[in-house]
């Protein structure tokens, strides 16, 4: 569950259950939207948490538009189909990502380490490795 007090939106979901968003207009089922050929990638991130590793990764993408939003909303924008990619190459903790990852995966997206394995939880270390969340 991710709640956005500023907008009154609530997101929930996961895996085999699908994902939804509720706002003043009601409940909407969420679906990711992969980038189409020739479409500029919509990348979510944070200008304040960018580092050299993130900048190097972004440089490999070609043309993209950076959408700066906070915390779990990055995953939610991917789940809504409003963005395509969220590279996080700086530290986060399990509690920063778990709920939002479930919502993204329920909408059809993925969250993987840089080695291509799914981001996992209940590890000995509470810090997450670097990861990329994607809409495809």
Predicted regions and their residues:
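Oxyanion/phosphate-interacting regions
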Residues: 56-60, 75-136
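Acidic beta-strand-loop-alpha-helix segment within the catalytic core
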Residues: 1-75, 125-136
């Amino acid at each position: 569950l991710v709640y956005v007090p500023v907008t009154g939106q609530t997101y929930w979901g996961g895996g085999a259950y699908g994902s939804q968003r509720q706002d003043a207009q009601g409940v909407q089922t969420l679906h990711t939207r992969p980038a189409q050929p020739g479409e500029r990638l919509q990348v979510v991130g944070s200008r304040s948490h960018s580092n050299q590793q993130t900048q190097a990764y972004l440089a490999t993408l070609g043309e993209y538009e950076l959408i700066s939003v906070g915390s779990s909303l990055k995953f939610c924008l991917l789940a809504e189909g409003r963005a395509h990619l969220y590279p996080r190459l700086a530290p986060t903790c399990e509690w920063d990502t778990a709920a939002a990852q479930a919502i993204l995966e329920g909408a059809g997206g993925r969250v993987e380490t840089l080695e291509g394995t799914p981001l996992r939880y209940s590890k000995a270390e509470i810090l997450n490795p670097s990861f990329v969340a994607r809409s495809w």
